[in-house]
Amino acid sequence: MRVPFADLKKEFKRVLLNLLFAEAKAELCAHILAANSRDGVYSHGLNRFSAFVNSVKGKEVDVYAEPGFVESHGMIDIWDGNSGAGMYNASKAMDRAIEMAKTNGIGCLAMRNTNHWMRGGTYGWQAADAGCIGICFTNTMANMPPWGGKEPRLGNNPLIIAVPHTDGHIVLDMAMTQYSYGKLQQSRMNNEEMEVYAGYDGDGSLTHNPSAIIKSRRALPIGYWKGSGLAFILDVLLTAITGGKSTAAINSTVNESGVSQFFLCLYKSDYNQMLIDEIIRYTKSSATVEPGGHIRYPGENTLATRQFNEEHGIPVDEMKWEELLKM
């Protein structure tokens, strides 16, 4: 089943308005959620909407809250998200980082006490669309064991790096686990196994089974000990600069809330597109493992999915769609 982008966005907005979000805030949040599904990140669009609604009803998300300025240190602004909607707060934070970068060449904003931003790549695309290099990351609840450990003590702390490109922006959007938990949940819902080992089951054996990994909470870090180390240092950096909650503090709450996020923008008038094109051509010149296979740069597949779904409609799970219509 497929639905037009406009219809999906309209239904999101209707529900958000009924939850007492202000018009402009409902519009922005609905657009981000619909765009996530449009771009193929279904786990952070329609499929996560009911969880977001529950977080509003459970008072983890304050529909009236606006992110607020706390202090500045040169080109670094510190904000408090005031427990507002994560995607709204993140979009406003990236807007401010872009504004600073357009004036000074660099802009940085760190925010504490905010909520899940849904797809982190949204804010990389936002920066690149504005002509800026964008780097952002967030901490999360503990959902990954440190390398050598059995129990979740690290967040999968997604990292996004975006570079403007005339033929389609380059946008890397990656969790510190081999697969995000959203992707694991999506695969479980579709009764699909993961393509490569994604974590450990309850017996400590590597597995492709998303249900076993979600139950054990032992997702596999990217690059093994390297991903574990990167997840750790991102949490340290965020906590040090924002004065907000670390993964340890986030995990002391019943549900994931009060996370910290970081937004960095760089701006110059010319990004040497010919040199970037050279990197892309050279990368794609490799022989493929599978005959007729494709080598893609980060963000390329997102653009292809976006264009296809804009033309043919966004694929939706019928049960999730009916659930949305009844909200």
Tell me what each language-model feature is:
Residues 189-250:
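Secondary-shell segments that build the walls of catalytic and ion/ligand-binding clefts
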Residues 2-3, 8, 18, 241, ...:
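Catalytic-core signal marking the mid-to-C-terminal active-site face
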Residues 1-3, 10, 14-28, 34, ...:
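Acidic, glycine/proline-rich low-complexity segments that act as flexible tails and inter-domain linkers
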Residues 76-166:
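A generic, well-ordered mixed alpha/beta core segment in the N-terminal half of proteins
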Residues 154, 158-161, 175, 229-245, ...:
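N-terminal nucleophile
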Residues 46-100:
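Active-site cofactor/substrate anionic-group-binding motifs, chiefly glycine-
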Residues 144-211:
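Phosphate/diphosphate-binding glycine-rich loops and adjacent basic-rich segments that engage nucleotide
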